[in-house]
A protein has these predicted regions:
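Short amphipathic alpha-helical interaction patches enriched in hydrophobic/aromatic residues
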Residues: 28-31, 36, 55, 59
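Alpha-helical hydrophobic helix detector
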Residues: 15-31
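Residues in soluble alpha-helical coiled-coils and helical-bundle/repeat scaffolds
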Residues: 6, 19, 23, 60-63
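N-terminal leader/signal peptides at the extreme start of proteins
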Residues: 1-7
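Aliphatic-rich helix starts adjacent to a transmembrane/signal segment
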Residues: 31-48
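Low-complexity, acidic interaction segments enriched in glycine
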Residues: 46-126
Length: 126
């Protein structure tokens, strides 16, 4: 009687492969989350630049600041208010009112997110 050799992997081989995969994951996962955070910060910076440019265009066209954030949408300076990538909502933007009594309205806009960016500055101060 000939004994047939079973096909498959031994327990040692499986453990070695699992150890290699575990090592690769410990390297890759932190980098993935850092890249995700960097992407969210980039989106936030771009959204703020677009909104601030829309506020400036509104002021240049009408010599007044928009009274509320929705005025930028109503007057078609932006199609819609972007979703804050950190709060995941479009209504959490905080506005800075104009200090000039002759030109009241939204002078600047910031994120409503808590926490700090990768550079250590508060997201709400961007």
């Amino acid at each position: 009687m000939r004994r047939r050799r079973e096909k498959g992997f031994t327990l040692i081989e499986l453990l070695i492969v699992m150890a290699i995969i575990g090592t690769l994951l410990t390297i890759a996962v932190p980098r993935y989350f850092r890249a995700l955070e960097h992407a969210r910060e980039t989106v936030l910076r771009q959204d703020l630049a677009i909104l601030r440019e829309a506020i400036d265009k509104h002021y240049a066209d009408l010599t007044e600041y928009p009274d509320v954030r929705a005025a930028l949408v109503d007057k078609r300076y932006v199609r819609s208010l972007p979703v804050d990538p950190f709060t995941k909502a479009a209504d959490t933007w905080t506005v800075v009112a104009s200090e000039d009594p002759d030109h009241v309205g939204v002078r600047d806009i910031h994120s409503g997110a808590e926490g700090n960016g990768a550079d250590g500055t508060a997201l709400a101060s961007w």
